[in-house]
Amino acid sequence: MCAGRMQKVHSDIRGPIFQEANRMSAAGIPILKLNTGNPATFGFKMPDSVRNALVENADKAVAYCDLKGMPAAREAIWAYEQSKGITSFTPDDIYIGNGVSELAPMCLTALLNPGDEILIPSPSYSLWTNAAYLAEATPVFYRCHQENNWQPDPEEIKSLITERTRAILIINPNNPTGALYPREVLQQIVDVARKHQLMILSDEIYDRLVMDDLEHVSIASLAPDLFCITFSGLSKSHMIAGYRIGWMVLSGEKYCAQDFILGLNMLSNMRLCSNVPAQSIVQTALWGHQSVRNYVVPGGRVCEQRDYVYKALNDIPGITAVKPRAAFYIFPKIDVKKFNITNDEQFALDLLHEKRILLVPGKGFNWGSPDHFRVVYLPRIEVLSEAMGQLGDFLSHYRQA
């Protein structure tokens, strides 16, 4: 018997389509999986300095640590986030967790009461929606549109605020679109939050995977007077998703958040501490040689694969896509009239069965129309070329029944 609060929780990235792909794999059918942003499975290697730090610290990283995290790790995170312009916080305002995926539910459980509302972008990674549902709160979606390069509209955000709204969440860079929010848009969101006295939550897990010489701006750096929580980690930027290392930074005015902070401390105590061996590499990862940067500059593997898949998708009749500026996802639009698509999950299943390619439909990212899907462009170009060729061939005759 399952608790009622679980009824709305979903994970289409690892949901029914993923389970069908696993069934096919178990039957000996090879599947090209373009559904998860798990760099190591596509041949990406962690920096040598990070590996060496893990080995060197292995004997010292065996006991529980402080509930918020190892002091040395929090000091390194403090210095890093300060370098991005975030002020009004100390190492004691940092909580280290087993990835942002652990910290998001902790945060919303401590923050939200049943019936409270949190503004969440659409499309967006389902972690945050599920965390809101587990807190018995209501996610309210503000739409980001392809025609606007997937940027949020501060006016729409403002129009959705009610007396039950507690916070505005942004995901920057965005998953699944790869959009990067410019300073002027972030400033407008800060102005809305300030006017309505709302907290700002910012998921910035992809902040070190920005391309095209663009700058990632942490929204908390624009709001030193507001209570902000910034989430980040090493899973994606250092290709070590399995190490489970993330953090959240509480900055700005905290006088209004003392009960929330007390709740966070209680929840942190319940899990004792996060992964200590992973914490032992934080200082080296953040302040050592940033070899991961080589992936996202022109000629770098992630950048080249981004350029390829963007062009290949737009060359398929009936598909249009906006060029991602960060992360390793693209969220193309499919002409639903041309292909008679009314159910994007069925489209993904049909593609899986015929071409053995696993994608995630837009439904999995809080997108209310059946006209988008996400592609992970972590595979090498020769693999992406095969996948895009198969997708084009599939769509050349596909019409949903």
Task: Go through each PLM region and give its residues.
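Conserved PLP-anchoring active-site segment centered on the Schiff-base-forming lysine
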Residues: 110-132
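A short helix-loop-beta submotif of the ANL/AMP-binding
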Residues: 133-140
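Active-site phosphate-binding strand-loop segment of PLP-dependent enzymes
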Residues: 140, 145-216
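PLP-dependent enzyme catalytic core of the Aspartate aminotransferase-like
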Residues: 83, 158-159, 340-342, 350-359, ...
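Helix C-cap/helix->beta junction micro-motif
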Residues: 27, 135, 195-196, 226, ...
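N-terminal small-domain helix-loop-helix segment of the aminotransferase-like
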Residues: 3, 7-99, 106, 273, ...
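Conserved glycine-rich beta-strand-loop-beta hairpin in the small C-terminal domain of fold type I
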Residues: 283, 299-310, 321-335
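Conserved core segment of the aminotransferase class I/II
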Residues: 221-300, 310-312, 395
